């Protein structure tokens, strides 16, 4: 039992050797395809209440995950935890690594994989890695382009390259954010971004939210002088 191990020089040397072995083994475990999210459940976390004697093993494991490409990512690869972000599953489901790269100016992979349940062992170990959060408040800040024309242009170019199906998911995400007060009203008032996709004969066109109208249900043809939201982005 752990409690029966004496804190002496010989045992400290053995403990330090175990810590080194754990770190050395992690890359081999990853290369064998076994370093999945479920594996994190077997690693020590802060709620285990381990005695100070065993802390070097925990610290070595955490440092390895932060500094080496060991942390499972949403894209299926592994990356240093220090270079990753964690966010709500609903945001991660809409914004891929390349999308997050636009807002963070960092190189993918960027999203850490999310555990199946919060506050379980996998989640507790991920919390110990101090992965940077990127959630609703960060999204709200990223979309506030009132004083940043360059960022506004980048977002408008980004939106113009998206499919109608993706735009539907993105609008739904924003709608939920505002409905649940996750995105600030302040942000809403300052979103001067042309990202509402409207009906156009040739190419997708985007306008400010205040410039677009939802068409009546029975409308099948659209006049050129009124900017109607493209039905395929909200139906």
What would you call each of these model-derived segments?
Residues 1-235:
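GHKL/Bergerat-fold ATPase module
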């Amino acid at each position: 039992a752990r409690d029966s191990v004496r804190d002496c020089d010989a045992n400290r040397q053995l403990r330090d050797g175990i810590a080194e072995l754990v770190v050395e083994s992690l890359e081999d475990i990853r290369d064998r395809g076994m370093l999945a999210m479920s594996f994190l459940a077997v690693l020590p976390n802060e709620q285990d209440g381990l005695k100070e004697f065993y802390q070097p093993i925990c610290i070595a494991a955490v440092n390895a995950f932060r500094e080496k490409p060991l942390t499972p990512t949403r894209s299926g690869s592994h990356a240093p935890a220090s270079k990753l972000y964690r966010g709500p599953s609903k945001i991660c489901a809409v914004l891929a690594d390349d999308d997050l790269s636009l807002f963070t100016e960092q190189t993918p992979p960027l999203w850490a994989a999310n555990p199946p349940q919060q506050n379980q062992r996998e989640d507790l170990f991920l919390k110990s890695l101090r992965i940077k959060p990127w959630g609703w408040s960060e999204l709200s800040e990223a979309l506030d382009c009132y004083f940043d024309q360059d960022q506004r242009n980048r977002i408008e170019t980004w939106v113009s390259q998206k499919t109608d199906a993706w735009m539907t998911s993105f609008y739904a995400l924003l709608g939920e954010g505002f409905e649940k007060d996750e995105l600030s009203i302040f942000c809403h008032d300052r979103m001067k971004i042309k990202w509402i996709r409207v009906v156009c004969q040739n190419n997708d066109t985007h306008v400010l939210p205040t410039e677009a109208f939802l068409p009546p249900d029975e409308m099948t043809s659209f006049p050129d002088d009124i900017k109607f939201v493209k039905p395929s982005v909200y139906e």
